[in-house]
Amino acid sequence: MPSILTALARSPTLRALVIVAVAVMAVGCASLDSRARQLMYRPTAARPEPLPTLRPGDEQTLVEVAGHDGTTEHVALWWLPNADRAAPTLLYLHGTFRNLYRNHPKMEALRDVGFSVLAVDYRGFGDSTPIVPSQRSILADADVAWAELVRRQPDSCKRVIYGHSLGGAVAIDLASRKHVHVDYGALAVESTFSSLVDLAGSAVGPLGPIAVWLSSERFDSLAAIAKVDAPILMLHGDRDDTVPIALGRKLRDAAPPGTRWIEIPNGSHSRLHENAPAAYRAAFESLIASLCSQR
């Protein structure tokens, strides 16, 4: 079992959680919640150089939303349509740190499999309004993207909710509030965890969960996934050093019967589409083939 020091060395997020936990215990100050969220989600607005190359017909738009203080804020959406107009549409929910500019290669891999891709940058990320994200704001932004998904894809069984890492928790929460066939066709999650408390505790011991419990964030996917009534695809790499595969398996065990679980040998946290492109493609092609089959 890796030591606490080894885990801390590997993950800046987990190091940050421990720092926050110690600070909160020492100071006992609720105002540190904002700092905790900054360190948990590590929002990035930076654009990489060079910028990703978009295809003709791709769109980047900003949607107006109300901020917590009543001001107007913006949520950035990307639309990457498939050449096949009959293709299903995948709602792409990303994880911490990397905004959509840095998620573009994975989004393209999913488009190449056979999806049109609608993606959202939560506020604090990419071209969206720069704020310190929270679970509440992230879920609200996912709802904004959901409304656009419904507009873009009128056939409910061709809507797929997808999330990577933290985005998997967002996707599970969203799916738990919708219904198969009525609202969407399937849920797919990649490299995600059972709960934020479990993630912190598995890597740094007792201080990690303390940091989470002293913040306003939970992302309890264990509780939410039991409410999902659609087909579920779960992928996880056995070399994931950000979200241990044990947490993916724990989530799998709590999922409804029939959930499809795929472990990628030597698979990393963010590059399963590159670590095992054939297996990755086959998993999603199988998902596409099953859509609308039981309507």
Model-derived features: positions:
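Short alpha-helix in the alpha/beta-hydrolase fold that links the catalytic acid
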Residues: 106, 230, 244-253
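An N-terminal hydrophobic leader/cap segment in hydrolases
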Residues: 24-67
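Alpha/beta-hydrolase fold nucleophile elbow
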Residues: 154-165
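Acidic catalytic loop of the alpha/beta-hydrolase fold
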Residues: 239-243, 270-271
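Short beta-strand/loop motif that positions the catalytic acidic residue
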Residues: 228-229, 234-236, 240
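Catalytic histidine-centered segment of alpha/beta-hydrolase-like enzymes
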Residues: 267-278
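Hydrolase active-site cap/lid region
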Residues: 170-230, 273
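Membrane-embedded segments
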Residues: 71-148, 152
